[in-house]
């Protein structure tokens, strides 16, 4: 049975909460907030008792897929398990009850946590300084590109171009464009690496930076990275690392040692904080020495005075690019990531990446016989398959992704990177056991066999999900995110 919208469960007079008695003088909201910011009519909020609210969202959670329910192999997304201890620590009253405008002396514990998290992230990536302010991966990208722009402006040599590989995440050219740059594509060679001849041909005095993901979205480590770094720096250009695939590098190698000037981290990928519901994310940015002065304001600093240690917010940063979010970043996500780092330590983080690489390598070994491997190189934490072989029977990658849902697995990332035809990008993460990997591989092999022997089974999938095959483009082209009660629709009609 279809679960109604929460609005459709609403009945006048049903309430799931009560407010405490007001203990301050009552004022009309119009006396406190300018009229242009006030609603003209009351919000249409549902009136539902607490147990119905709980049941509603529990039912929805059983209809959706999530990392607590099963493997979630989205490539370049690192959908690892989110440890529940993270939720315990982030809910501690000393963290959850804080207000960002409290006096600094009253939030020393929070500032210490943020400072230590910065220091650990610096060490992990070999950078000179870190800002925790960006609240998402793409937000971290934009911050990094604005830092690069400010650097070149201060040099008196503003530049016009950002180089972006053809395997890059779509946010890379988007971030560059928002920052005012023209993006220029760099080709991938037959081994799945940056084409050095094409890079040299496009590297001129107008290039501000190259944005590179390492390992790249094919799951292959850019083994020419030191040569790339030398080329960029000899040209007066900077090197940016998209940190989406950091889960392959922890404790093994560091972006700073490769010559990167900027890197963004994804706490919601590498450091186990939740992805769900579109956030909240966190995309801290680490920089080399030459970019420290441009980092967002305020900086979180440690002060020593005799035997006393304190932490403060420093707003006196004249060359800063300014604030990148309302306050200091998504603090509760920082607490979760801090907890994850404390639990693992240096050796544990290296084990995370080693196991992520082992899992991906094993899974590829199970699947390579039935699917095409377009770039057959040593992979790291993820890999790309092509569904071109199955397409000869009329079955596309999209169809196989839909069929996977019937077996309790989320589909991998599909049709990205764009340079792989009928692409499936698979990232198992370190969280999954060999048994789960084998279950996933068995299902993938079964689907490959069905594509040959019974293509209709795959073409009409999914068969067992609460909602069958959807129009994948309709919602994007017909956006309607406002609920209007049916009685209002009738009146307005």
Curated annotation (Swiss-Prot):
Its cofactor is pyridoxal 5'-phosphate. The keyword Oxidoreductase applies. GO terms for cellular component: cytosol; glycine cleavage complex. The modification N6-(pyridoxal phosphate)lysine is found at residue 269. Keywords: Oxidoreductase, Pyridoxal phosphate. Its EC number is 1.4.4.2. One of its GO terms (molecular function) is glycine binding. Belongs to the GcvP family. C-terminal subunit subfamily. NCBIfam families: PRK04366.1. The glycine cleavage system catalyzes the degradation of glycine. The P protein binds the alpha-amino group of glycine through its pyridoxal phosphate cofactor; CO(2) is released and the remaining methylamine moiety is then transferred to the lipoamide cofactor of the H protein. This is Probable glycine dehydrogenase (decarboxylating) subunit 2. It comes from Chloroherpeton thalassium (strain ATCC 35110 / GB-78). The gene is gcvPB.
């Amino acid at each position: 049975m279809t679960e109604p919208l929460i609005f459709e469960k609403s009945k006048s007079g049903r309430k799931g909460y009560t407010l405490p008695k007001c203990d301050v003088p009552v004022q009309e909201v119009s006396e406190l907030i300018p009229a242009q910011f006030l609603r003209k009519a009351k919000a249409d909020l549902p009136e539902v008792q607490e147990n119905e609210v709980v049941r509603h969202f529990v039912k929805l959670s059983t209809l959706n897929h999530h990392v607590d329910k099963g493997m979630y192999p989205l490539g370049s997304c690192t959908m690892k398990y989110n440890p529940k201890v993270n939720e315990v620590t982030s809910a501690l009253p000393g963290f959850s009850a804080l207000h960002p405008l409290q006096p600094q002396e009253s939030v020393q514990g929070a500032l210490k946590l943020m400072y230590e998290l910065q220091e650990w992230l610096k060490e992990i990536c070999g950078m000179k300084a870190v800002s925790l302010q960006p609240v998402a991966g793409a937000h971290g990208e934009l911050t990094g590109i604005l830092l690069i722009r400010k650097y070149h402006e201060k040099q008196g040599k503003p530049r016009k171009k950002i180089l972006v590989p053809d395997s890059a995440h779509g946010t890379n050219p988007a971030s560059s464009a928002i920052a005012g740059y023209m993006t220029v594509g760099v080709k991938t060679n037959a081994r799945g690496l940056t084409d050095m001849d094409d890079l040299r041909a496009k590297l001129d005095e107008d290039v501000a930076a190259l944005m590179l993901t390492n390992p790249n979205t094919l799951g292959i480590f850019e083994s020419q990275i030191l040569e790339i770094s030398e080329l960029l720096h000899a040209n007066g250009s900077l090197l940016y690392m998209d940190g989406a695939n950091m889960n392959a590098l922890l404790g093994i190698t560091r972006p700073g040692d490769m010559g990167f000037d900027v890197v963004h981290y994804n706490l919601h990928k590498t450091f186990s904080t939740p992805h769900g519901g579109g956030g909240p994310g966190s995309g801290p940015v680490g920089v080399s020495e030459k970019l420290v002065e441009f980092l967002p304001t305020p900086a979180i600093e440690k002060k020593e005075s005799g035997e006393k240690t304190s932490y403060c917010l420093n707003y006196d940063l004249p060359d800063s690019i300014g604030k990148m979010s309302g306050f200091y970043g998504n603090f509760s996500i920082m607490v979760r990531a801090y907890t994850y780092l404390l639990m693992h330590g240096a050796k544990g983080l290296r084990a995370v990446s080693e196991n992520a690489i082992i899992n991906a390598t094993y899974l590829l070994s199970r699947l390579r016989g039935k699917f095409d491997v377009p770039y057959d190189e040593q992979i790291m934490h993820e890999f790309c398959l092509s569904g071109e072989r199955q397409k000869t029977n009329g079955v596309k990658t999209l169809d196989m992704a839909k069929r996977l849902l019937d077996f309790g697995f989320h589909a991998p990332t599909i049709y990205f990177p764009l340079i792989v035809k009928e692409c499936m990008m698979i990232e198992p993460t370190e969280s999954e056991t060999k048994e789960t990997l084998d279950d996933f591989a068995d299902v993938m092999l079964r689907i490959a066999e069905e594509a040959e022997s019974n293509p209709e089974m795959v073409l009409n999938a999914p068969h067992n999900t609460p909602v069958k095959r959807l129009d994948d483009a309709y919602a994007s082209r017909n956006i309607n995110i406002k609920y209007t009660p049916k009685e209002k629709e009738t009146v307005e009609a």
